[in-house]
Amino acid sequence: MNSPEDLMELPLDLDGLTPDWVTQALSHRYPDTAVQAVSIDGVIAGTASKARLRLAYRDGGNPHGLADTLYAKGGFHGPQQLELGGVGYVREALFFRHLAPKLEDLEIPGAFFSATNAVSGQSIVLMEDLTTRDVTFGKATSPVSSDTAAVTLEWLASLHGRFWNVPVSDELQPWPGVIKEVTTTLLSEEFWGAMTGRPLAAPVPDAMRNPERTRQALEAMWAAFDNIGPQTLIHGDAHLGNMYFLPDGQPGFLDWQSPMRGPWADDVTYFLVGSLSVEERRKYERELLQHYLACLGAQRGVVAPGFDDAWLAYRQQVMHGFMWVATPPQMQPDDIVAANTERFCAALEDLETLRALGL
């Protein structure tokens, strides 16, 4: 069933974010809001566009005490961007409408409006401007400490635990998401050769430069899913670039374009291997995995996997992050791709991922 918000016309460019449109959007959840002026104070364009809006309210037009700045996220930079990322925009809008209200005790950005339009393909979320809370945004070139990793695993255990083996929205994409859909393109001789031929790909083991070998490993990982344990709600893209940290160090997750019903080990392995330095990961990964399992097992109604099964699942899931090497520069800067490639290639060998997958 559509929400009343979905009946709104959703602008396809930034010029459409007028005072009247923002007033109408905010009034769905915050009646009697009246915006007098909107100015765009910075734009980040990628798979989705994120525009920082500075609002001026009419006298008496802010009875709910809304902030003077917020972010509008959607496809505002042409049909190609909308075609590329539109499915993700829909999922994020639906996440903030249906699932975020069930996660109020977890740190995620606030959302003031979320809507999707099946005709235009546009979806828009008006969300909190996190800079007003003096957060620090995660970046792969700045790995976290083992203590921060432990707190983040507590966050993930809380997310996973409350949806453990419980049906969640049918609108979620099936695990493993887009990576499986684009495998043929990623592993084509032309594309794979170009990506693994870059200097940043120097850590890639010789065997994995063969796209067919990589395909076999990915397919073995996906096939192993049935042995990983109960499904749950996962973030689906739990890397440092999708995280932020409050001044007291508490973590939060951004970018909910890829929530999935899938295996807990996807989030845990992707986060741990990608967020710790190689040295820290080698030193603390077993201890941190045990910590996650203890936190998961403390959730109501959850029987956490035993350590041996969890360790195997953790080793197998390294293949997800290994695919960072196939990320082109128009999607992520080279320094971010290089940092993740180094960490996942080291883990691939340290953890004998191919052997864990029966290859």
Regions found by a protein language model. Give the residues of each.
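Regulatory N- and C-terminal appendages and interdomain linkers associated
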Residues: M1-G46, R58-A67, K139, D170, ...
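Short helix/strand-bridging catalytic loops that position acidic/His residues to coordinate divalent metals
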Residues: T136-S145, F253-Q257, L272-L276
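Conserved ATP-binding subdomain of kinase catalytic cores across diverse folds
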Residues: V38-T185, W264
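ATP-dependent phospho-/nucleotidyl transfer catalytic cores
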Residues: V135-H235, P247, R343, A347-L359
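Short acidic (Asp/Glu) and glycine-rich catalytic loops that position anionic groups and cofactors
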Residues: N2-S3, P247-G252, D266-V273
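Secondary-structure capping and boundary motifs in well-ordered enzyme cores
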Residues: G42, V119, T148, P230-D237, ...
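Active-site acidic catalytic loop and adjacent metal/ATP-binding pocket
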Residues: G46-N62, Y71, L218-W264
